[in-house]
Amino acid sequence: MAGSATVEKRLDFGLLGPLQMTIDGTPVPSGTPKQRAVLAMLVINRNRPVGVDALITALWEEWPPSGARASIHSYVSNLRKLLGGAGIDPRVVLAAAPPGYRLSIPDNTCDLGRFVAEKTAGVHAAAAGRFEQASRHLSAALREWRGPVLDDLRDFQFVEPFATALVEDKVLAHTAKAEAEIACGRASAVIAELEALTFEHPYREPLWTQLITAYYLSDRQSDALGAYRRVKTTLADDLGIDPGPTLRALNERILRQQPLDAKKSAKTTAAGTVTVLDQRTMASGQQAVAYLHDIASGRGYPLQAAATRIGRLHDNDIVLDSANVSRHHAVIVDTGTNYVINDLRSSNGVHVQHERIRSAVTLNDGDHIRICDHEFTFQISAGTHGGT
């Protein structure tokens, strides 16, 4: 359990930037790249067992050396020595937990855990109409980011899908913060940030919605209309699609010079996000469990790890025995607030809600997923799942 690691010294871990381990605020060098990759996997999956086989796959993918298992044990032993040398009981913090090891730490001793907590608090505050409080929480969440996720370990393939999913979560936090700031009457203050974000993420329509709203509420109607034309052209030229109904309706209101109710809009958006967050924790207070329900067989595949890989090879968490499925086809990442699916450059793609995904997509309870001939329903439910 997370509360089992009661120590006098302050142990802290960072994933939202280069991997970081500090004790009482002092950075602790954590060894070779492979040893740091083991630590990263343990922090990503904190308070959950990580199998030795999963660690081997993370380090060597399909080509582990003959001594891979012994190397994993050696890396863990070295990490324990680092902890012990700093006065922390390594057998409590980094314990054997079949089929591997578990890093037991409070969630608030990891930057990702703090990001999730602050983002969740901010969204709940916005849904209740407390926009100043929402802005403070969301700003605190974004301050946890020091740079690209695990930037020093990008050579390891497990990092990319995890980082991509967290960037999705970060963009959502930026969007929610901008909406809260606009609801507080500070539309002009967020324009520069939103201009930079829409340049970096040109297909994220919610960011464009906030930028266009901020322009309009700052008496810059021509800029608002120009921004709509830009996103419409970008979506058409690059993706072959039109803006969604929210953006189209916003543009129509601006053309007619109608007033915008920023507070009502912010509460509505946040309330929808709260519904998604609350799916994770049922009324009983038990942590929700996510599954992929195989429509053909009725089998339920639990999504228990921080990242669940799907593909043809047997080193995947969910193995799909089909020639059309790529060796490593897709991954579903639990970011702490959302489940995000990402196509791992597969040959035949991943379809969510009957559309092929072009980037990471946040899953909602009940979503239909198709991977070649295999069809699933994404489900979040409390307790055990009878189809496993």
Curated annotation (Swiss-Prot):
GO biological process, alphabetically ordered: phosphorelay signal transduction system; positive regulation of DNA-templated transcription; regulation of DNA-templated transcription
SMART domains assigned: BTAD, FHA, Trans_reg_C
Entry's Gene Ontology molecular function annotations: ATP hydrolysis activity; DNA binding; GTPase activity
Keywords from the UniProt entry: DNA-binding, Phosphoprotein, Transcription, Transcription regulation, Two-component regulatory system
GO terms for cellular component: peptidoglycan-based cell wall; plasma membrane
UniProt DNA-binding residue ranges: 2-105
Domain FHA: 308-357
Post-translational modification: Phosphorylated on threonine residue(s) by PknH, PknA and PknB. Phosphorylation enhances the DNA-binding activity of EmbR. Dephosphorylated by PstP.
Pfam families named among the record's database cross-references: BTAD, FHA, Trans_reg_C
Domain notes from UniProt: Contains a N-terminal winged-helix DNA-binding domain and a regulatory C-terminal forkhead-associated (FHA) domain, which mediates binding to a Thr-phosphorylated site in the cognate kinase.
Subunit structure: Interacts with RNA polymerase. Co-immunoprecipitates with DarG in the presence and absence of darT.
Function: Positively regulates the transcription of the embCAB operon. Exhibits ATPase and GTPase activities.
Family: Belongs to the AfsR/DnrI/RedD regulatory family.
This protein's name: Transcriptional regulatory protein EmbR
Species this chain originates from: Mycobacterium tuberculosis (strain ATCC 25618 / H37Rv)
